[in-house]
């Protein structure tokens, strides 16, 4: 064995071992537990595919899937619309462009739980007080089973817009100026310019952002943990939160392992 191959193995094997221990092995154990009635502690029995069949008849599980996909779709649309508008503005010829880009990226580097608890205080105390001063009821949006999900969308969008904006700016900077010059000769301005020239050329970046947003929002957990903890009346219970809450403290480790396998 030559020195180059030995070095390659010395670098690769520890990484693969760590990946197997902290990623692959828990995945395998989760799949195994999904065929049991394991409660997270003590003994357990094999139940076959009963956990999987019960998942399709459990109303709470179905409700969490509907909520998660609704949240993911709405948040993905909101984030991409806002990100694209911001990217177009920050890519134009304006003063302090670099400083503004840095400022808009700040939310992305903050912890999701920290942001969630800050917005929790805002929605619970500050916003109701302002609404009361304006003559409204002043009820917290987080206490409404009808509107609490909107607060989660707002927090998710506020924190996610930054990264998507950067990706869109990267896409806009790949568009040659010659294209715009040729388009202006043909009378393309404003909306026509964006629709016929800009958007088709940044379509790959749009696709990337849509996929990343959908993936991230389908796994939403931190914001729900900080804002609503799945309430009120389980109206904002995402799949990830349901798996965590009922699996860890609800004695449904095996059942929720099956849920996690299906969701995976």
Residue ranges of model-derived segments:
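A structural signal for multi-pass alpha-helical bundles of membrane permease subunits
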Residues: 3-264
């Amino acid at each position: 064995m030559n020195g180059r191959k030995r070095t390659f193995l010395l670098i690769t094997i520890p990484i693969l071992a760590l990946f197997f221990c902290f990623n692959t092995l828990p995945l395998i154990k989760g799949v195994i537990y999904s065929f049991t009635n394991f409660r997270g502690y003590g003994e357990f029995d094999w139940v076959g595919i009963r956990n999987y069949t019960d998942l399709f008849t459990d109303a709470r599980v179905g409700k969490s899937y509907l909520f998660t996909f609704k949240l993911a779709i709405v948040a993905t649309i909101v984030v991409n619309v806002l990100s694209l508008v911001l990217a177009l503005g920050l890519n134009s010829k304006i003063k302090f462009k670099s400083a503004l880009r840095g400022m808009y990226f700040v939310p992305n580097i903050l912890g999701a739980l920290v942001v969630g608890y800050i917005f929790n205080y805002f929605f619970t105390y500050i916003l109701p007080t302002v609404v009361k001063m304006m003559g409204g009821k002043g009820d917290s949006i987080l206490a409404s089973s009808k509107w609490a999900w909107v607060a989660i969308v707002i927090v998710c969008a506020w924190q996610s817009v930054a990264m998507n904006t950067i990706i869109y700016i990267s896409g806009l900077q790949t568009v040659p100026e010659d294209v715009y010059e040729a388009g202006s000769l043909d009378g393309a301005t404003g909306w026509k310019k964006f629709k016929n020239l800009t958007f088709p050329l940044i379509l790959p970046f749009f696709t990337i952002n849509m996929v990343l947003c959908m993936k991230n929002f389908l796994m939403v957990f931190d914001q729900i943990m900080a804002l609503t903890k799945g309430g009120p009346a389980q109206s904002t219970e995402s799949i990830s939160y349901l798996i965590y809450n009922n699996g860890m403290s609800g004695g449904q480790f095996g059942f929720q392992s099956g849920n996690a396998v299906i969701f995976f």
